[in-house]
Structures are given as C-alpha cells and as structure tokens.
C-alpha cells in the first residue's frame, strides 16, 4: 500500500485513527475484561450487556459522525470529513462485538480467535490492495478496518449469539460496572 498511496493520505488517515482511538476507549468501558472475570453472568444478563453495548455503540458512532465536521475544520482537511463518517461504522461494530468477543476469550477459544483474525485480515488486506490499485487513494486505507470490524462481528455473533433487548436491566449493567469501572480508569 505504501507504494500505491501518497504519504499525505497516510497522514490524513493517521489523524482519523488517533481520534477514533479516543472514542473507542469510551465504547469499551472495561466491559470485556469484566465479562471474562465474572463467573455468575447468566444468558439474560449477557443479553442486557450486549444491548447496552449496542446502544452505546450507536451513541458513540453518532457522536463521532457529528464530530467529523469540527475535526475536518480544525485540521483544514476536507477529506477527513468523509473518512470520519465512514470510520463511524467501525466504532459501532467494534462496540457491538465486545460481548461476543469477550465470551470467546472467556471460553478460551484462542484457536478460533486466531483463525478468525487471520482470515479477516487476509481478506481485508487483499480488498485494500485491490482498492489501492484501482485508484481508491486514502479510502483504500480505511477499507480494511471497516471491513474487518463488520466481518469479525458477523463471525463472532454467529459463534456466540446474543439477543437484542430494546431495554436493558440496570441491575445487570450496574453489576458489570462494579468491575469494569476500575478497568476503564
């Protein structure tokens, strides 16, 4: 990719990556380690936590999406606007993948996680290279993270299915936050 894309375009994507990393911290909130450590989580509680991460992911993605205008104005890079808009999908899928991924780690399915990651990164890398060859420019750099987060979620949710609740029990969230708050800080 380095031979196909200008260094300036790498810089623009690097700016967006640093900013999205900040938003990602708030989407996780230490929930994954709390799920791994807690031995008393029922399926119902896990569904509550999954629903919470979904709604949190929607909120943080919208916040990042709306922040893209001030970000692009601050850095005087109009291309940052569309990059941030597209990367907001990455934030959402990373957030909703917290519970299924934590359950995979909790169940010590490391081989599955490794194969899943290898498969997704190879496919995403090939797609990114093909996009760069076809002239996608800096968009070729964000295809892989977006594609990867979506595909990892699809694979993980099929392996560890969760049910969406439109409301979630505050007791379940409070129970998990008693541990995750320390992880977050």
Spans of model-derived segments:
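Alpha-helical transmembrane segments of multi-pass membrane proteins
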Residues: 22-26, 62-66, 77-103, 114-122, ...
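Membrane-interface junctions at transmembrane-helix termini in multi-pass inner-membrane proteins
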Residues: 34-43, 93-116, 139, 160, ...
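Primarily residues marking transmembrane-helix entry/exit sites
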Residues: 10, 45-46, 80, 138, ...
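Interhelical loop/hinge segments that connect adjacent transmembrane helices in multipass membrane
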Residues: 111, 115, 154-185
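Membrane-water interface segments that mark the loop-to-transmembrane alpha-helix transition
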Residues: 12, 16, 25-69, 82-88, ...
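Hydrophobic/aromatic residues in alpha-helical transmembrane segments
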Residues: 1, 28-32, 67, 100-101, ...
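Membrane-interface helix-loop junctions in multi-pass transport and translocation proteins
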Residues: 2-17, 69-73, 81-85, 108-111, ...
């Amino acid at each position: 990719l380095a031979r196909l894309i200008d260094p300036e375009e790498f810089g623009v994507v690097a700016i967006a990556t640093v900013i999205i990393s900040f938003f990602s911290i708030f989407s996780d909130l230490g929930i994954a380690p709390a799920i791994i450590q807690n031995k008393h989580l029922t399926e119902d509680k896990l569904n509550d936590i999954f629903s919470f991460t979904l709604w949190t992911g929607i909120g943080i993605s919208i916040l990042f999406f709306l922040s893209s205008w001030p970000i692009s104005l601050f850095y005087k890079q109009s291309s940052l606007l569309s990059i941030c808009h597209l990367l907001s999908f990455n934030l959402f899928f990373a957030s909703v993948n917290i519970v299924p991924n934590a359950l995979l780690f909790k169940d010590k399915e490391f081989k599955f996680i490794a194969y899943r990651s290898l498969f997704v990164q190879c496919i995403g890398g090939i797609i990114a290279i093909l996009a760069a060859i076809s002239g996608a420019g800096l968009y070729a750099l964000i295809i892989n993270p977006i594609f990867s987060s979506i595909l990892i979620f699809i694979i993980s949710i099929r392996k560890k299915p969760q049910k969406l609740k439109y409301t979630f029990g505050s007791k379940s969230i409070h129970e998990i936050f008693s541990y995750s708050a320390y992880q977050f800080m």
